[in-house]
Every structure is written in C-alpha cells, then in structure tokens.
C-alpha cells in the first residue's frame, strides 16, 4: 500500500519515528457540484499508492453499479461513503481522509458543493491550512466558486490552490486556463486574497494529469503538480509564536501536593520562569514547571498539550487564559464578529445563547446584525434575522468578560461557536473581528460608571459577596437548608437573600418546562440575578435542582469561581419521594429529577450535606463554617 512499505517491514520503529517527525498539512477540497472533488481525492490516494488492494477491488465492483466514469474505475467512490451520495453522485457531508508521502502527512476534508451545505463547508474549513478550489474548465468561475473562496478567506485559510479540472475536455487549451485564472484573480482581489498565496494548476482528476505527476499534455504549464504543491507549501510560518495563549481546560489535582493547569497551547511559546497572568482576573505568577506524561519540559510551543504549575497559589479555573504578563489580549464582554449561521431555526437578535470560545463557556446574546453578506455578490444588506447558511457581521454581548484576540491574529482565541441553550446544539460559528477599545481590561458591566466601589459595599455590610448554590434532587431539603442559613446570617447582621427555584417560576422564569433543559435554564437565568446581588454586596442563597453539570459550570463562569460555592444536598430517591414537599411524586409527574431525566451529581461540590444523617442545624453550621473559611463572613 504505502510508499514506505519496505521500511515498515524492515524496521517498524524507524518508520514510526520518521512518521512522527513529518509535518501535518490539513487541507480541504471545495467547488461546484460535480467539479470532481471526490475524484481528485481518490486520484491523490490512488497515485500515491495509499489504497488497500481489497478496497480498490471493492470500488472497481461498485463502479460498474453506481459509477459515473464508464469503463474506468470511479475513484470518487473512495470518498463518497453515504448511500445517498453514491445514489445521487454528489457529496453531502464532510468526509475526512488521511494519507502520507515521504515528505508530509495529510488530512483531507472533502466538503459538499451545494449551497444548502455551506455550513458543512465552513466546518471542514475551520481547521485547514490550505484549500483546493476546483473549477470545471468547461464553465469557469461559478457562483459556488465565489462562495467557497469567500468562506475560505473568511476562515483565515492562507494558502489556496485553484485546480482547473477537466482540462482534458478542453484539450488542455492554454487560453482556457489563462482566462479562468484572470477571472479568478479579479474576484480574489475583491475579497482580499493575496496573489502570493494563490496557485493555479491545470489538471484532469479523472485521468491523473498534473495531480501527482506532471502531464505531457500540458507542456506550456511550467508550474508544480498538485502533489508537489501540497508537499512543499510553507505552513510553518503560519504559526503564531509571538502571542502566548494558554486556555485552561481543567485544573489538575491528582493529590494534595500538586496543582496544575492543563490545556493545549493555542499560540506562542511558554518557558519555565516566564511571568504570566490569568485572565480575566489579571492575577499574576511565574511558571514553575511544564509537565507532560513523558516528563517535564523546559519550554512548549503551539499545539502541545501540557500542564503548567505556577509559583503562587492564584485562582485559575477552566475557561481562564494564561498569557505573558507583557503581551495580553483584550479582556471584554462585547465584540464584533463574522457569523455563519448553521441551524434551521433562524438567529434572533437578543435571544440568549451560550458562547463557547476555546475553553470558556459564557452566556450571551447577539444584540444586533450590522449587515448581512451575500456571498455570491459580496453585497451588504441590512437584516433582522439570520437564516441557515447565511453570513453576517454581528455584535456579540457576553454576560461575563473573557480574554480574546482577533481571528486574523489567532484562529483559536479569535473563534467561537454559538450553542442553543435548550438543545445544546451548535447553531453558529463566528470569527472575532474587533472589540470596543473602551472594553479593554473591563471585568464587568458594573465598574467605571459606578460611584460606590465593591470595597465600600464590603465595608458597609461587613462581608464579601458570595453565591451559594444548594443543588440536589426534588425533596432533598435544598430550600429548607437555604432559608435556615438565611435566618442565621440575617440574625448575625448580614445582607442576604434566598432565590428559590420554585418561587421564581411564578415571575422571572414563568413558563419554563420542568424537564432537564427547563430546570437548567431556570438556574442559569437566576445566576444572572445572583451575580447582580453579589455586585450589590449581598450574599445570594440559591435553592435549585440545577441537574446539568454543564449548566452549573456555565453559572460558575458567569458568577466567578471565587464567588460561587456549590453545596450538594444529598438524600436518596426513596427518601425524597417520601418527603415530597411539593407533591411532585404524588402527582405522578413525568419530569422528576433523577428518574425521568438524569441528575448530574456535583462531584466537585465544595460541600456535601446528607440531610438523612444531619439535622438542619448541623447543616447550617457547616455552611457557615465554609463561608468563614472563604472569608465571606
């Protein structure tokens, strides 16, 4: 099968070592319907000897049944795997294939050419270094050509190969090639593609001309074959080595003596002893060690998954970003972005969504559409909603600030996805364009315009603001415990208030369903209120089922890890059913937490109170002790 089969049979370890050192190039193929994308990939695999013999025999048989190439083997069948694709002779979903040569490793994304699958193309392009845009020599630059070129430009793909395919049907006429090249260059100038990043290749994917080997049928073409371009295009310089960005994926605490922050370095280089700050908090420290499974490193670069330990015990949580102290990104809760809408349900300005950028997960909304972009004509038009496959420049507003870069500067920290809060489906993909300069360094809406500082409020109330979430099954005793803690704190002269999940369903959260998604949304909406109470200096006590671990993590990002305390109020389902304070179990409802739908036990809870084993008074004492430990009271 492989060009290196001899080395594999002689010395497998040498082969694996050589293979590991190869540079990886991710590229995608796109173009109009039936331009030959899947055939091109099949040809690349076939001519680079990356097809197993039994696989080749299988597609030879299939070619006679569903092939479109007459007596020839239909190499497109190597990639068109869905039954609907083979029946219709088109590509519907993004198909990924892997192959390698002596010089490089490759991952190919074969993207669909139809307009209704623009979102699939955007998905395939998001991680690619290079795009191959196929043009049928018979038709020249088409609407889909312009659309895919615009999306490739939008998604920051820096290298584009314009493959003018089916030149055999035009007898490899140089005039046809030059005319299509001129037409494409005129369009490329409009969308800002640099001519230095463009390569034009006349080819026949079906016959193999100029795909892997140079063709004798185009003696006038002095350039490289497609494979030569793929093997030699310079992508190492595309990596950002200047701006150190380390999104924290999780806090690694295997034992009491180790606390590290795990993640993948998005860009830049980090070394032992580097001064870093955690954003958005702005707290600083130095890198103590860079830990991997194989041992410690002196430095790490883009794409490496490592665990960083710091000299100081500063508060760093999932979603935070570690950066060099002298090279900080913007910290803001608002920015402009180019957004590709990927859902059947239209995007409505002002609707609440979850915005996921790298490891941060923050509630937010899209207040307005600046303009929609017609990807066929590049015309800008106003809009009040965004439909499936439409692209627009929008304004994004977050409920909590995050650290971010522009997409051109950093494709990881400058990109985000939009998630529907009820279905958890990805509905949009965005590229950050800019952020308001005034937002730099902001940490919340409440700040520069406030006349009363947080310190003054803390001094007046004699406490530090905090939110305590009492989470557990229905009937576990959450509300009972929350109100008892409120009574005790109030008698101590503290400013405190209970936000009860059931009470809020009569007003703020009226109409929300009682299922898992509805109960998660019930808590997330209230988390905004709790945050505002904290801004006012109060202690918020929240009694909610909050069944979703993901929803609780989102609330932590919103309120702040240093302010949110999670108390798991524990009781067995049988005891909860016997207590049944709201009559939920007796009514035979089909929305019972832990029975009708899963309840994610808070494994990382700050405190666990077993209401079967402890009295209310004992539970109150444990909560107060924890508040004192956190220096809230």
Curated annotation (Swiss-Prot):
Membrane spanning residue stretches: none
Region (G2): 89-93
Molecular function in Gene Ontology: adenylylsulfate kinase activity; ATP binding; GTP binding; GTPase activity; sulfate adenylyltransferase (ATP) activity
The protein's Enzyme Commission number: 2.7.7.4, 2.7.1.25
Positions of disulphide bridges: none
CDD domains hit by this protein: APSK, CysN_ATPS, CysN_NodQ_II, CysN_NoDQ_III
Region of interest (Adenylyl-sulfate kinase), residue spans: 464-633
Pfam (any one): GTP_EFTU
Positions bound to GTP: 31-38, 110-114, 165-168
ATP-binding among keywords: yes
InterPro entries: APS_kinase (IPR002891), CysN_GTP-bd (IPR041757), CysN_II (IPR044138), CysN_NoDQ_III (IPR044139), G_TR_CS (IPR031157), GTP-eEF1A_C (IPR054696), P-loop_NTPase (IPR027417), Small_GTP-bd (IPR005225)
Chain ranges of the tr-type G domain: 22-241
Annotated region described as G3, given as residue ranges: 110-113
Claim: Aminoacyl-tRNA synthetase is one of the keywords in the record: no
Catalytic reactions of this protein: sulfate + ATP + H(+) = adenosine 5'-phosphosulfate + diphosphate; adenosine 5'-phosphosulfate + ATP = 3'-phosphoadenylyl sulfate + ADP + H(+)
Assigned keywords, A-Z: ATP-binding, GTP-binding, Kinase, Multifunctional enzyme, Nucleotide-binding, Nucleotidyltransferase, Transferase
Region Sulfate adenylyltransferase: start-end pairs: 1-463
GO biological process, one term: hydrogen sulfide biosynthetic process
Enzyme class: transferase
Pathway: Sulfur metabolism; hydrogen sulfide biosynthesis; sulfite from sulfate: step 1/3; Sulfur metabolism; hydrogen sulfide biosynthesis; sulfite from sulfate: step 2/3
Location of region: G5: 204-206
UniProt region (G1), positions on chain: 31-38
Subunit and interaction comment: Heterodimer composed of CysD, the smaller subunit, and CysNC.
Family: In the C-terminal section; belongs to the APS kinase family. In the N-terminal section; belongs to the TRAFAC class translation factor GTPase superfamily. Classic translation factor GTPase family. CysN/NodQ subfamily.
Official protein name in the record: Bifunctional enzyme CysN/CysC
Gene label: cysNC
């Amino acid at each position: 099968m492989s060009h290196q089969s001899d080395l594999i049979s002689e010395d497998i370890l040498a082969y694996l070592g050589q293979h590991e050192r190869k540079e990886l190039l991710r590229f995608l193929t796109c173009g109009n319907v039936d331009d030959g994308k899947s055939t091109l990939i099949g040809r690349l695999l076939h001519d680079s000897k990356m097809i197993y013999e039994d696989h080749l025999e299988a597609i030879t048989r299939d070619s006679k049944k569903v092939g479109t190439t007459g007596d020839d083997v239909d190499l497109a069948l190597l990639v068109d795997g869905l039954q609907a694709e083979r029946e219709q002779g088109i590509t519907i979903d993004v198909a990924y294939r892997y192959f390698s040569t002596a010089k490089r490793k490759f991952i190919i994304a074969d993207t669909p050419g139809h307009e209704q699958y623009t979102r699939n193309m955007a998905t395939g392009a998001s991680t690619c270094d290079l795009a191959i845009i196929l043009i049928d020599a018979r038709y020249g630059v088409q609407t889909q050509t312009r659309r895919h070129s615009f999306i490739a430009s939008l998604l920051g793909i820096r290298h584009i190969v314009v493959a003018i395919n089916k030149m055999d049907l035009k007898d490899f006429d140089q005039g046809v090639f030059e005319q299509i090249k001129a037409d494409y260059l005129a369009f490329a100038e409009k969308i800002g593609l640099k001519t230095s990043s463009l390569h034009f290749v006349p080819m026949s994917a079906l016959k193999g001309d100029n795909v892997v080997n140079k063709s004798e049928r185009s003696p006038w073409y002095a350039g490289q074959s497609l494979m030569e371009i793929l093997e030699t295009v310079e992508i190492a310089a595309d990596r950002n080595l200047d701006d150190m960005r380390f999104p924290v994926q999780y806090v690694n605490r295997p034992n009491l003596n180790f606390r590290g922050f795990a993640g993948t370095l998005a860009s830049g280089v980090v070394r032992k002893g580097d001064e870093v700050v955690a954003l958005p908090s702005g707290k600083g420290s130095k890198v103590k060690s860079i830990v991997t499974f194989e041992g410690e490193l002196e430095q790490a670069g883009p794409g490496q998954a490592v665990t960083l330990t710091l000299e100081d015990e500063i508060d760093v949580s999932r979603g935070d970003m570690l950066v060099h102290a002298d090279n900080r990104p913007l910290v803001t809760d608002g920015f402009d972005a180019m957004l590709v809408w990927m859902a059947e349900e239209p995007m409505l300005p002002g609707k609440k969504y979850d915005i996921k950028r790298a490891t941060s997960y923050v509630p937010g909304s899209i207040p307005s559409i600046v303009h929609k972009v017609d990807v066929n004509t590049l015309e800008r038009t106003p809009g009040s909603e965004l439909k499936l496959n439409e692209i627009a420049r929008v304004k994004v507003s977050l409920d909590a600030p995050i650290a971010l870069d522009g997409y051109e500067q950093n494709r990881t920290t400058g990109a985000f996805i939009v998630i529907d809060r009820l279905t958890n489906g990805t509905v949009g993909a965005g590229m950050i364009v800019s952020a308001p300069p005034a937002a730099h360094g902001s940490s919340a809406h409440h700040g520069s315009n406030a006349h009363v500082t947080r310190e003054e409020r803390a001094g007046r109330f004699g406490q530090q603001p905090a939110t305590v979430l009492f989470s557990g099954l229905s009937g576990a005793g959450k509300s009972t415990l929350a109100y008892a803690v409120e009574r005790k704190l109030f008698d101590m002269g503290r400013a405190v208030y209970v936000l009860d999940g059931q009470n809020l369903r009569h007003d703020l959260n009226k109409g929300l369903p009682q299922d898992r998604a509805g109960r998660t949304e019930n808590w997330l909406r209230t988390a905004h209120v709790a945050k505002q109470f904290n801004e006012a200096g109060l202690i918020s006590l929240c009694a909610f089922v909050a069944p979703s671990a993901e929803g609780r993590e989102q609330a932590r990002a919103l309120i702040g890890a240093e302010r949110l305390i999670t108390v798991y109020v524990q009781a067995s389902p049988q005891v909860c059913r016997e207590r049944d304070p709201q009559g939920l179990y007796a009514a035979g409802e089909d929305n019972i937490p832990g029975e009708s739908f899963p309840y994610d036990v808070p494994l990382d809870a700050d405190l666990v109170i077993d209401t079967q084993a402890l009295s209310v008074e004992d539970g109150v004492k444990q909560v107060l002790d924890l508040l004192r430990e956190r220096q809230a009271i």
